[in-house]
Amino acid sequence: MNPERQYTACVAGLKEFVEGIGGRGVVLGLSGGIDSSLVACMCVDAFGTENVHGYMLPGPYSTEHSLVDAQELARNLGIRAERVSIAEAYRVFESQLSNLCPSFDRSTAGENTQARCRMIVLMALANFYGWTMVNTGNKSE
C-alpha cells in the first residue's frame, strides 16, 4: 500500500471512530515530536481546525526546543494550542514513587509517569468538554 493511501485510510478510520461514538471534537497533546505532529495533521484533516484542541504539557523532561516545535506545528495547522505544566503533578507522583522505586526520577518509569500525567489532563479535558482524546505512544510507554 502506498503512503498516501495509508494516510487517507487512517484519517477515514479516525473520523469514523470519533463520529461513531458521538465525539464533538478531539483533544491531543502536542510534544513537537513526529508522532504527535502526524496525529495532529490527521485530526485536522478528519475534523477541521475548529474541532482539534491541542495542549502542550511540559514536565521535567521537556525541552524548550520541543515546545517551540509544538507551537510552530499548531500555528502551521491553524489550531489553538494551550500550554499547561504538569510539573507539579509529576512531583507529587515522583515523591510517592521514589519511596518505592530507587532512582525513580532517572528511570524509564519516571519518564513514562510524565506521559501518564499528561494523559490525566487530556482525559479530564475530554470528559469535561465532550471531546475524544486522541493519543500517541511508543514501545517504552
What positions do the PLM features span?
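Structured core elements
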Residues: 27-29, 38, 53-56, 80-85, ...
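Residue-level signal for inorganic ion chemistry
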Residues: 33, 74, 134
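Aromatic/hydrophobic pocket-lining residues that form π-stacking "cages" and hydrophobic walls in ligand
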Residues: 14, 70, 122
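Nucleotide-activated chemistry modules centered on ATP-dependent adenylation/adenylyltransferase
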Residues: 7, 23, 89-141
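RNA-binding accessory domains that recognize and position tRNA/RNA substrates
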Residues: 1-27, 45
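ATP-dependent adenylation/pyrophosphate-handling site
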Residues: 24-30, 34-71
